[in-house]
UniProtKB/Swiss-Prot annotation:
It is found in: Nucleus; Nucleus envelope; Cytoplasm, Cytosol; Cytoplasm. Pfam families: Ras. Its cofactor is Mg(2+). Keywords: Acetylation, Cell cycle, Cell division, Cytoplasm, GTP-binding, Host-virus interaction, Hydrolase, Isopeptide bond, Magnesium, Metal-binding, Mitosis, Nucleotide-binding, Nucleus, Phosphoprotein, Protein transport, Transport, Ubl conjugation. This is GTP-binding nuclear protein Ran. GTPase involved in nucleocytoplasmic transport, participating both to the import and the export from the nucleus of proteins and RNAs. Switches between a cytoplasmic GDP- and a nuclear GTP-bound state by nucleotide exchange and GTP hydrolysis. Nuclear import receptors such as importin beta bind their substrates only in the absence of GTP-bound RAN and release them upon direct interaction with GTP-bound RAN, while export receptors behave in the opposite way. It comes from Homo sapiens (Human). The keyword Cell division applies. There is a cross-link at K71 (Glycyl lysine isopeptide (Lys-Gly) (interchain with G-Cter in ubiquitin)). The gene is RAN. The lineage of its organism: Eukaryota, Metazoa, Chordata, Craniata, Vertebrata.
Length: 216
């Protein structure tokens, strides 16, 4: 039996992407998850239990964060095994981190077939954006969901989790009924910039995909 108030619905979520893209910053925004995280020494991983309250009851994502070991090459299969969903993160101010997204996707689906995956472009609060909406096409080719996010400003923090929860529960009408306590914003996302980026993404969605054979 789950303890009183303990979510019975939980999912293993793996968070992958190049080092320095903001994965740890992102997961640490959720304050109770940061407070209750556990370190798995055998895999060199921190597991953050992120609880979200929905109209279908509480849902917990046990978010596996690599603690930086991706800087030394790929991750071991033990990190991916039994993952039920994933977030792949890149940094919109660094083109190389987007170029590496197909490698992360390949490693992930080699171990975890057919799990829901969200692609997130982080650091959209920074004015010097290099990876624009029109060049982010990988998710369309692989049937992933995409969101612009800004971990430091909390912009769109909940979006990847809501999309994954709807997929995993099988209810497109699932909603979060309360937002989790998040760390105060370290930067402010310019509302005009956010509106522009949302418009750019809508336009990009309706643009034909390029014909080239490579993965990006």
């Amino acid at each position: 039996m789950a303890a009183q108030g303990e979510p019975q619905v939980q999912f293993k979520l793996v968070l992958v992407g190049d080092g320095g893209t903001g994965k740890t910053t992102f997961v640490k925004r959720h304050l109770t998850g940061e407070f209750e995280k556990k370190y798995v020494a055998t895999l060199g991983v921190e597991v953050h239990p992120l609880v979200f309250h929905t109209n279908r009851g509480p849902i917990k994502f046990n978010v596996w964060d690599t603690a930086g070991q991706e800087k030394f090459g790929g991750l071991r299969d033990g990190y991916y095994i039994q993952a039920q969903c994933a977030i792949i993160m890149f940094d919109v101010t660094s083109r190389v981190t987007y170029k590496n997204v197909p490698n992360w996707h390949r490693d992930l689906v080699r171990v975890c077939e057919n799990i829901p995956i969200v692609l997130c472009g982080n650091k959209v609060d920074i004015k010097d954006r290099k990876v624009k909406a029109k060049s982010i096409v990988f998710h369309r080719k692989k049937n992933l969901q995409y969101y612009d996010i800004s971990a430091k400003s909390n912009y769109n923090f909940e979006k990847p989790f809501l999309w994954l929860a709807r997929k995993l529960i099988g209810d497109p009408n699932l909603e979060f009924v309360a937002m989790p306590a998040l760390a105060p914003p370290e930067v402010v996302m310019d509302p005009a910039l956010a509106a522009q980026y949302e418009h750019d993404l809508e336009v990009a969605q309706t643009t034909a995909l390029p014909d080239e054979d490579d993965d990006l």
